[in-house]
Swiss-Prot record:
InterPro entries documented for this protein: 4Fe4S_Fe-S-bd, 4Fe4S_Fe_S_CS, Electron_Trans/Redox
Gene Ontology CC annotations of this record: plasma membrane
Topology class, membrane: Multi-pass membrane protein
Protein name, as recorded: Uncharacterized protein MJ0749
Positions of [4Fe-4S] cluster 1 binding: C194, C197, C200, C229
Biological source species: Methanocaldococcus jannaschii (strain ATCC 43067 / DSM 2661 / JAL-1 / JCM 10045 / NBRC 100440)
Annotated ranges, domain 4Fe-4S ferredoxin-type: 185-213, 210-239
Ranges that cross the membrane: 32-52, 69-89, 121-141, 146-166
GO MF annotation: an example: oxidoreductase activity
Presence of the UniProt keyword Transcription in the record: no
Length: 246
């Protein structure tokens, strides 16, 4: 008996396009709802510093505690779903890079030089350590001006390079990446179906080399790659490995 468990796998292209469109709509709805919720919970004060502090260090607001537990459990099960579906800042950074794609009619998302990118992705772990150290040593960072300056800076950087903050800086993303490393459901590539067109890589906002090695720790489960793969070579599944070329 085939013990593999699939949640998203397709052989029929028409069915796949339909389903992926629905998943993208669902993702947009989820992102919007969580964004509105964040606005209400914070009294319209969207502070990156506050967000990091609440998530990494914690606070006593029940809604935050529940969101944090959900994000970590989801990371264990399916990876960084929080980043792609729930994070209010992820939503904003998603919007700005999509705006750039629309304005400049881009066919391929802008990329950072490969060597620099491969080093920069580790910077967010340094930020995570710094945040914990700052907390332990009693350093307090706050202020409206700083919050909005940081948001503006990362929105501009996110306009130039998709999800810049999420890729390189966010300590919440780095914390969830650690759990995502062991996630049950993973994004997989079937090398027998892949024709090497790299359409998926052109659309990946996290600049993952999907056709070489899918970095599950970096993947934010946006499923943009699956939406553009015309060969159905990508699947999101549990208990399976990448299918090697026969
Ligand atoms: S879009 Fe599909 S077929 Fe093309 S490179 Fe990516 S996985 Fe392979
Ligand atoms: S690999 Fe696919 S699901 Fe993961 S971040 Fe890139 S486009 Fe999104």
């Amino acid at each position: 008996m085939d013990s593999r468990v699939y949640i998203i796998k397709f052989d029929n292209w028409g069915f796949m396009v339909n389903l992926m469109n629905k998943i993208q709509i669902l993702r947009k709805i989820s992102q919007t709802l969580f964004f509105v919720r964040a606005l209400i919970v914070t009294g319209f004060y969207l502070s990156i510093v506050g967000f990091i502090k609440r998530f990494i260090i914690g606070d006593r607001i029940l809604a935050t505690i529940i969101t944090k537990i959900i994000a970590i459990v989801l990371a264990f099960i399916a990876g960084r779903v929080f980043c792609g579906w729930m994070c209010p800042f992820g939503f904003l950074f998603n919007l700005v890079y999509e705006l750039r794609v629309k304005l400049f009619k881009l066919k391929k998302l802008p990329t950072v030089d490969e060597k620099i990118h491969n080093k920069l992705i580790y910077f967010k772990y340094v930020v995570l350590i710094l945040v914990v150290l700052a907390y332990l040593s009693g350093v307090k960072i706050s202020g409206y001006t700083l919050a909005y300056l940081l948001l503006a800076l990362f929105l501009v950087l996110g306009f130039i390079y998709p999800m810049f903050f999420c890729r390189y800086v966010c300590p919440v993303g780095s914390l969830l990446s650690i759990f995502a490393r062991f996630s049950i459901f993973k994004l997989k590539l079937d090398e027998n179906k892949c024709v090497g067109c790299r359409l998926c890589e052109r659309k990946c906002p996290m600049q993952i080399k999907i056709t070489e090695k899918i970095d599950q720790m970096e993947c934010i489960r946006c499923f943009e790659c699956m939406s553009v793969c015309k060969k159905g070579a990508l699947s999101f599944s549990a208990f399976t490995k990448n299918t090697k070329k026969e």
